[in-house]
């Protein structure tokens, strides 16, 4: 097994883990329909920034 040469202090351990957290995805709300979608992506019904950009199956 590997053995550490020097013990890492709690402060250094915390600084090492500072970037290990998860971030929630940034959601945007479509102005025309009120649906939530990922930013810079179209909504499930084909709208992007208030305009219909993709035809859906129901149309």
From Swiss-Prot:
Pfam family, one: Ribosomal_L32p
Disulfide bonds: none
The UniProt record lists the keyword Phosphoprotein: no
Any one annotated GO CC term: large ribosomal subunit
InterPro entries: Ribosomal_bL32 (IPR002677), Ribosomal_bL32_bact (IPR044957), Ribosomal_zn-bd (IPR011332)
SUPFAM superfamilies for this protein: Zn-binding ribosomal proteins
Domain of life assignment: Bacteria
GO molecular function (one): structural constituent of ribosome
Keyword Transmembrane tagged: no
UniProt keyword list: Ribonucleoprotein, Ribosomal protein
BP GO annotations: translation
Similarity annotation: Belongs to the bacterial ribosomal protein bL32 family.
Name of this protein: Large ribosomal subunit protein bL32
């Amino acid at each position: 097994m590997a053995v550490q040469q020097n013990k890492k202090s709690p402060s250094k351990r915390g600084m090492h883990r500072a970037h290990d957290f998860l971030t929630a995805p940034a959601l945007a709300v479509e102005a025309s329909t009120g649906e939530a979608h990922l930013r810079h992506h179209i909504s499930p019904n084909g709208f992007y920034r208030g305009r219909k950009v993709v035809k859906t199956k129901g149309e």
